[in-house]
């Protein structure tokens, strides 16, 4: 089960049934919620987003 703390500008529920709405997670695993902006390459190890732009700091 991936931890997800997303109370900033959206709602994330990472549990048995994961839901993600307007998510701006800083530590949300890709397997739970796709928190990277559309067009960003998803990371195999998980997605860490810093903002809503698609650059090298979006996923690491």
Curated annotation (Swiss-Prot):
Top-level division of the source organism's lineage: Eukaryota
Binding site for a divalent metal cation 7: 49, 54, 58-59
SUPFAM superfamilies from the UniProt entry: Metallothionein
MF terms in GO: metal ion binding
Protein residues bound to a divalent metal cation 3: 14, 18, 23, 28
Residues noted as binding a divalent metal cation 5 in the record, renumbered to the chain: 33, 35-36, 49
InterPro entries: Metalthion_dom_sf, Metalthion_dom_sf_vert, Metalthion_vert, Metalthion_vert_metal_BS
UniProt entry keywords in alphabetical sequence: Metal-binding, Metal-thiolate cluster, Zinc
Region described as Beta: 1-28
Renumbered residue ranges of the record's region Alpha: 29-60
Residues reported to bind a divalent metal cation 1: 4, 6, 20, 23
Binding, a divalent metal cation 2: 6, 12, 14, 25
Residues that coordinate or bind a divalent metal cation 4: 32-33, 43, 47
Binding site for a divalent metal cation 6: 36, 40, 43, 59
Stated role: Metallothioneins have a high content of cysteine residues that bind various heavy metals.
Protein family per UniProt: Belongs to the metallothionein superfamily. Type 1 family.
Record note on domains: Class I metallothioneins contain 2 metal-binding domains: four divalent ions are chelated within cluster A of the alpha domain and are coordinated via cysteinyl thiolate bridges to 11 cysteine ligands. Cluster B, the corresponding region within the beta domain, can ligate three divalent ions to 9 cysteines.
Protein name, as recorded: Metallothionein A
Organism: Gymnodraco acuticeps
Taxonomic lineage from the root: Eukaryota, Metazoa, Chordata, Craniata, Vertebrata
Gene behind the chain: mta
């Amino acid at each position: 089960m991936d931890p997800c703390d997303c109370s900033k500008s959206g709602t994330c529920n990472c549990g048995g049934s994961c839901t993600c709405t307007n998510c701006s997670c800083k530590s949300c695993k890709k397997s739970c919620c796709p928190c990277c902006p559309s067009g960003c390459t998803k990371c195999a190890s998980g997605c860490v987003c810093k903002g809503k732009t698609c650059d090298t700091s979006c996923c690491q």
